[in-house]
Amino acid sequence: MEQKSIKGTRTEHNLLASFAGESQARSRYTLFAKKAEEEGYMQIAAIFRQTAEQELQHARQFFGMLEGGMVEITASYPAGVVGDTATNLAEAAAGEHEEWGVLYEDFAKVAQDEGFPKIANAYKLIAKVEQMHEQRYLKLLEHLKSGMTFEDEQPVEWMCINCGFTIMAKAAPKRCPVCGVDQGWFERKAINY
């Protein structure tokens, strides 16, 4: 059975807008990572970079569903500046929310209505990832605003992401006693293996 073409459909326009949006998010997050690094937040920088790579994969998925040729779209994208890390986290969370809570829900419905169930499903699955991105950015922002990026109310295990040194404490050391990097290189140790 021949697959239905997306040429000239709203779904085609939505896929291209999604590709452009994911590509731009990747670039913004790369810029935000550099700023976080400059401000001494290495974990936040790493998370921005990881998310940027995930956005590249989303862009790749949307691009791969297109059928070629020139397509004209009209869409709005953030035209802001790189702010401080707190501002960047807030902007990133808002962008992720718009993707999963507004755009991709609508795009999935359009794709379904136009007879593209696989594309609709891709939007639904990617929306779940974008929701997780938003939650992660909001948690990092909460820690940053409350002064809990490098502190906790209870002792936790802190790990230097440069050398692997760990210590159980309420706050990360100001400097790593093993490799000498500053506190910005510490994060709460995650056991995810």
Say what each PLM segment does.
Residues 1-193:
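Non-heme di-metal
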